[in-house]
């Protein structure tokens, strides 16, 4: 077992299993960039190891349609070019991504429509339907010459999932009876006691929460939760309201679900334009942006920046979601903005209108009892999640052993005693407009410096003897404003003249020496003024005798 993503972090899942000289890849997901990567939205696993083993990869099996499990396929597939296997719903989502990337016709995509095992080289893979917060989540029973692995993917036990079947406990029990060498198990909610709750209870609570409202009702939730979408539609119908979807990602998941046979009993939702023409007290909107994303519909609506939707005093916004760690500040700002506009805000803290799609401790214990694995391998979590599930499985639940693996570890699962064999290269790639770049690349380091310290640009116009024939020109970005900016620029330009005078007093300077001297002078002035160390660039323009060209114009040519 070699995890390339998802072990030591939540998101970006990619795991490889190897035996008999062949490799099976499970999932290929992305994660969202944080503030340390300015200008970057998406991060994917570094597939260097998979690329080196590309000829021996027998297939990529996708467990389900969440972005952290399939969102990197269209970015990375060219690196390993193996067949891809997915159920109809996940395949429908993936096809649109492959089409956008221009590789739809290149990828050998197999849509798995039944329970027949996949024969992939030395691996025999059987899909097991489990409940999750999106459709068609599949655990994988992976038979190998040295034992069977059960890779759970993301899952929970829910007797009323509302859309799709309940988790197939009979299949899990049957595999447990045959013998499971290792249970590779979701760790996301290891710190949550009890159970994760039922989608059926959320539906009932949403219906109650919407009843009796006078103004516009807005619900915001994760777009991929199709059962929650259907629950919002039921709440609208029960309250005598028209149901509308606002946000492209909601329409994407709705249309994918309809195309593969779900939501067939549900009336077509209105779009935002159609909803805007209806009486406000007769409409329920389901919107994207439950995490306060700047480009999500909810943030635009709250900021009165949406072309069709306007909130008024007395309306209500229902957040049928949890706050993902790291989004707290953004969401509280959104809540405050709504409150200031006298919009009622309802969250999961107020009413039970959200449940997780991942197992809490009682569900994990039940999974262990059903499967009875020889060993537990926690995945899908930060280090603290993995370590705690390993402890919980062995100390609290009596499993024989557990092993914590992090991205890049090579863990031998069999035959014989499990042991770490070494490590492979791992890392993160940022999805940039120019392509995939290492998150440690100089380009991104410069962006971070720009975002934190600002920038300074210098133009020097000199003659053949390196003497200034125009005053230095300095521009500062993101460093100061107004009078402070003008004073700082004046100080910087005087410092350049002073330092260049010292250099040319010794000997004629070349362009590099002039530029380095000017950069040092400006950085020193700025650092002394406000402690910043700006990204600083200098263009040196040499002119023939008698030539006079404005430095500002030449700057455009120089860069």
PLM regions and their residue ranges:
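Hard-cation-handling environments
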Residues: 191-320, 324-349, 353-507, 515, ...
């Amino acid at each position: 077992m070699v995890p390339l993503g998802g072990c030591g972090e939540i998101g970006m899942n990619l795991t490889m299993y190897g035996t008999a000289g062949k490799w099976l890849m499970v999932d290929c997901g992305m994660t969202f960039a944080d503030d340390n990567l300015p200008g970057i939205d998406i991060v994917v696993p570094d597939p260097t190891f998979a690329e080196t083993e590309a000829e021996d990869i027998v297939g990529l099996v996708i467990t389900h349609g969440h972005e952290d499990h399939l969102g990197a396929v269209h970015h990375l597939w060219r690196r390993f070019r193996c067949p891809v296997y997915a159920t109809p719903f996940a395949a429908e989502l993936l096809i649109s991504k492959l089409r956008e990337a221009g590789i739809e016709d290149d990828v050998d995509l197999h849509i798995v429509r039944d329970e027949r095992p996949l024969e992939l080289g030395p691996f025999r893979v059987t899909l097991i339907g489990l409940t999750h917060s999106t459709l068609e989540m599949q655990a994988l029973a992976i038979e190998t010459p040295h034992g069977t692995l059960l890779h759970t993917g993301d899952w929970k036990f829910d007797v009323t999932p509302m859309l799709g079947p309940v988790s197939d406990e009979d299949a899990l029990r049957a595999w447990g009876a045959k013998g499971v060498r290792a249970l590779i198990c979701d760790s996301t909610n290891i710190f949550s006691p009890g159970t994760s709750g039922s989608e059926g209870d959320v539906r009932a609570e949403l219906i109650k929460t919407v009843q009796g409202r006078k103004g516009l009702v807005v619900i915001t939730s994760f777009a991929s939760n199709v059962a929650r979408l259907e629950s919002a539609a039921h709440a609208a119908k029960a309250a005598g309201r028209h149901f509308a979807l606002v946000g492209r990602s909601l329409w994407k998941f709705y249309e994918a679900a309809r195309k593969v046979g779900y939501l067939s009993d549900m009336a077509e939702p209105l779009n935002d334009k159609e909803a805007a023409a209806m009486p406000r007290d007769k409409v329920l909107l389901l919107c994207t942006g439950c995490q306060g994303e700047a480009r999500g519909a909810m943030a635009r609506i709250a900021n009165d920046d949406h072309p069709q939707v306007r909130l008024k005093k007395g309306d209500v916004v229902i957040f049928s979601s949890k706050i993902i760690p790291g989004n707290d500040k953004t969401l509280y700002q959104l809540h405050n903005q709504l409150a200031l506009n006298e919009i009622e805000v309802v969250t999961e803290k107020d009413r039970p209108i959200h449940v997780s799609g991942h197992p809490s401790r009682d569900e994990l214990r039940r999974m262990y009892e059903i499967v009875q694995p020889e060993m537990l391998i926690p995945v899908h979590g930060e280090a603290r999640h993995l370590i705690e599930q390993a402890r919980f499985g062995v100390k609290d639940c009596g499993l024989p052993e557990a092993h914590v693996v992090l991205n890049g570890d090579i863990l031998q699962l069999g035959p014989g005693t499990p042991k770490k064999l070494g490590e492979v290269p791992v890392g993160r790639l940022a999805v940039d407009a120019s392509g995939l770049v290492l998150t440690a690349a100089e380009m991104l380091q410069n962006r971070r410096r720009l975002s934190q310290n600002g920038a300074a640009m210098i133009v020097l116009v000199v003659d053949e003897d390196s003497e200034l024939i125009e005053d230095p020109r300095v521009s500062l970005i993101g460093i100061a404003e107004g009078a402070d900016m003008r004073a700082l620029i004046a100080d910087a330009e005087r410092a350049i003249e002073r330092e260049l005078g010292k250099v040319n007093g010794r000997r004629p300077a070349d362009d590099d020496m002039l530029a380095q001297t000017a950069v040092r002078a400006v950085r020193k002035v700025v650092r002394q003024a406000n402690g910043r160390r700006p990204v600083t660039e200098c263009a040196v323009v040499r002119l023939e005798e008698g030539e006079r060209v404005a430095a500002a114009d030449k700057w455009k040519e120089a860069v």
